[in-house]
């Protein structure tokens, strides 16, 4: 890997790892709450508020639903995204951090918005189109927004469902290609999935997937 790519990985990977670590902490608290409920115990007010706030953030319906069902839905959305996938998507969208959006606006993932207060007009936007590229104060905020996007947007429902199947089956995301295949809606380019898979393997990004044993939580 050349110097620019190395520098990009050195800057972005710790932020990705931090996001996944936060998700692991949330998952464990949800699992603990679920186990508590399964013993027919009542959750503390703090835990109830915690679950309600997460449900709002991750667009999970709570009205007239048992808390265990709410937690089960949250566990589908609140799960890690393998480091290699996040790195590859960021590298692809930002030209390994060299794009104008990345250098001037901390926008690594090319996320769209229609909010004029949070976006800039892309240079090659087609006439009549109104989308903007979301900008961020820090790279951390860009990565955080990407995680929320993948973990909540309906376009990535297939990704989340497969991730749950893998999680339930063997708790290991060793074959990231399977997950990348479910991110075809991320871009209009029909070859997008193949491009991301190539970036992962050509740059041996899966070597970063086991950092901090991120993939061992139940």
Q: Which residue ranges define each predicted feature?
A:
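Catalytic cores of secreted/periplasmic lytic hydrolases that degrade extracellular macromolecules
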Residues: 1-88, 92-218
């Amino acid at each position: 890997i050349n110097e620019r790519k190395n520098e990009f990985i050195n800057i972005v990977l710790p932020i990705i790892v931090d996001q996944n670590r936060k998700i692991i902490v949330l998952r464990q608290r949800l699992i603990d709450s679920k186990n508590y409920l399964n013993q027919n115990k009542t959750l503390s007010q703090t835990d109830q508020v915690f679950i309600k706030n997460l449900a709002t953030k991750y667009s999970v319906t709570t009205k007239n639903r048992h808390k265990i069902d709410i937690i089960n839905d949250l566990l589908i959305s609140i799960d890690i995204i393998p480091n290699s996938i996040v790195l590859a998507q960021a590298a692809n969208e930002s030209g390994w951090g060299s794009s104008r959006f990345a250098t001037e606006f901390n926008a690594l993932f090319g996320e769209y918005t229609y909010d004029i207060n949070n976006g800039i007009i892309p240079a090659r936007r087609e006439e009549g189109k109104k989308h903007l590229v979301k900008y961020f104060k820090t790279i951390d905020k860009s990565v955080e927004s990407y995680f929320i996007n993948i973990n909540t947007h309906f376009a990535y429902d297939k990704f989340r469902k497969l991730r749950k199947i893998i999680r339930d089956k063997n708790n290991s995301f060793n074959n990231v290609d399977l997950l990348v295949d479910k991110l075809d809606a991320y871009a209009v380019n029909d070859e997008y999935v193949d491009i991301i898979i190539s970036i992962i393997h050509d740059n041996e990004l899966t070597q970063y997937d086991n950092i901090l044993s991120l993939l061992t939580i139940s």
